[in-house]
Amino acid sequence: MAEDGSPATIETTTVHAEVLDDTDPTHLRRVAELRTTGVDVLDTLATQRASLRSLTPAPGELELTETPRWIHYPWRRTVVRLLGPLGFRRLRLDRNRNKITTAEQEQLSQLRIGIVGLSVGSAIAHAIALEGTAGSLRLADFDDLDLSNLNRLSATILDLGVNKAVLAQRRIAEIDPYLRVEAWTCGVDEHTIDAFLDGLDLVIEECDSFDVKVLIRDRARRRGIAVVMETSDRGLIDVERYDLDPDRPLFHGLLGDIDSASVAGLSVREKIPFGLRILEGSALSSRMAASVLDVGTALSTWPQLGGDVLLGGASVAAAVRRFGLGEPLPSGRVRIDIGDHLDQLREPHLPRDSTSSAADHTVRTDALDVRSLYDTCTDTDAVAFAATRAPSGGNAQPWIIDVDTTRLTLRIDETRSSTVDIEHRGSLVALGAALHNARIAAAHRNILGATEVSFDGTARIAFATGTDPQLAAQLPGMLNRGTHRGAPETDPASTNLADLTDLAAGLSTETHRIHLIEDRDTIDRLAETISATDRIRFLTDRLHREMIAELRWPDSNDLDTGIEVTSLGTPAAELVVLELLRRPDVMTHLNHWNTGQVLRSETTSRLTASNAIAVVTQTGTSAGDYIRGGALAEEFWIHTQSLGYSVHPMTPLPLYATAEHQLRHLSTDRIDELTTLWNELKTLTDTTDNNPATLILRIFRTTTPAPTSRRRLPHHH
């Protein structure tokens, strides 16, 4: 019975797609019977299974071993063999990922949605079914397909005279026979509305009748059911969240305090002003507004275009996703007006920091004549200049260099630190490299006096008559030293590393050692570990922002610091990927999905193809220990490059952590993974918390020179 006591007449379809199970003898007899009637049989099960097995990640055992089904479509006189519901859904919806994740797809499959009006509503139902964003659909329309509907409704002339709800139901069954779809061929009225709304989470209203529009909202409000409407003119999306605000007025209050009782008995003419208020006449397109005035004289009804209806289907499908996932979808209206957007067509703007602009520039290997600049310096300035040529993480140059006639002083610039620079240890290593360079220049200019490294991490060189031939001989190599981030060009196993082994042994001291890793298995494991820490750096918002901030494009205003993108060793054609890697919102999604393994690929490939990995280690963790370790690393780098090798320093995320609590400073969300990687790194590099790594260097052969990076000028007094 309906609410007013009158009998409710509900008409639904009785001709559905039959789903027949291979393991049910009764169903198998039905399939055999159908074959005798001359139905067409379509069996591509082998191909479907092959496609299912090829998916990444691999399907589970239940999906792979599930019993297939036969689907009988009586209106097509066809029987189709398909994967069972689990495998079918996994394969059919696989290309949704990760616009819709697997977990989100499962959440959306619980939605129960009703659609009233299957002209515009047909496109909406189709879009929802395509995306698999509902577990059941209830479709209501009393009208049959007319030839005049074929300008906007996806059907064919073979469907003329078929009820519109039935047409939508059939179309969906041919997309997903496992999706529950009810077709209410009686439409919706005062007697059937309550039964229609029973169990629904959301109702989409696309009917022509003003009375029914009011009725649906009135009863949906009583039940706390949200209502969405799309009007194809200028792409109007209308959302009324009665589930969140059951006291809100119908139609956002545009019609005042109205309900279904207050509009009962109004004439068609009396309803026209209400319709115009709902449509907001001032916001109609000019063609639609003019057409409304012609309805009944020059036009039989208001116009609708197929493209606009299809857009409406996509728009409402997007709203359904938000609703089902609990994402922001407030009550209100918005217009998705394609015409307005087409009026805004413009030539694309190429930002100065785009990868396209970077691709137009080649790697600059001789833009700076470092030796000529050095030769033009006074003796004290030459020492300061040499200090600036030291390497540092992200080319941050985290030092303050003061020079006068008596000495050069180096100290940490804490403003140039980063999260990875735990307790400024990376900065101290860079300071040590700068100190070594300065001593080389002082020896070359014959002004090398006493060197002092203070407990607080300050380093000084006094200027006095003096030299060191071994230091002075390193000048050409020091000025030519550079970071090469490119890929190796030779087989890593084909190079004899005896010269490198001798160098590492000769430079090692009792407190600071150079450990050369040549074993291919160890290098491969290091590549896996270090690349995994790189992935965490990408996926952790603060670390990602700091990393991207280090990059410099050719037209940047600050090329004296940071890393020029043209020096990354990435082929110009692949630089476009940087446009994705630099976006925090992209990394946020990958982090949420726990994916993004591709973020490891470049580090992995570069490390595994290297000839050797050098690990500079130290005894102790004082500031002086890191400074002296940095000086040793720089000396080794200079000599290694002079032997014809290329060098690329690697900074695994936990490199400068010497206690587990310091890892939380890096990434609280991935602390367990990071702790595991930290322990693996220490094992592979033979380091401990008291004998940590100073620096890790990737060493390889290539015929291309390292690009020359720019530097800030030192301070003078």
Model-derived features: where do they sit?
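A structured beta-alpha segment of the ubiquitous adenosine-cofactor-binding alpha/beta core
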Residues: A165-D201, C207-K213
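Glycine-rich phosphate-binding loop and adjoining beta1-alpha1-beta2 segment
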Residues: R81, L139-D176
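Acidic, surface-exposed loops and disordered segments
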Residues: D308, P328-H717
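Glycine-rich adenosine-cofactor-binding loop
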Residues: E104-D146
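E1/E1-like adenylate-forming module used to activate ubiquitin-like modifiers
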Residues: A2-P59, G199-G307, R346-P351
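Phosphate-binding loop/pocket of nucleotide- and phosphate-handling active sites
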Residues: E3, V31-R95, A319-D381, N395
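Short gly/pro/ser/thr-enriched loop/turn and capping motifs at secondary-structure boundaries
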Residues: L145-S148, D233-E240, Y656-A657
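Mid-domain beta-loop-alpha active-site segment that forms a flexible
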Residues: T301-G324
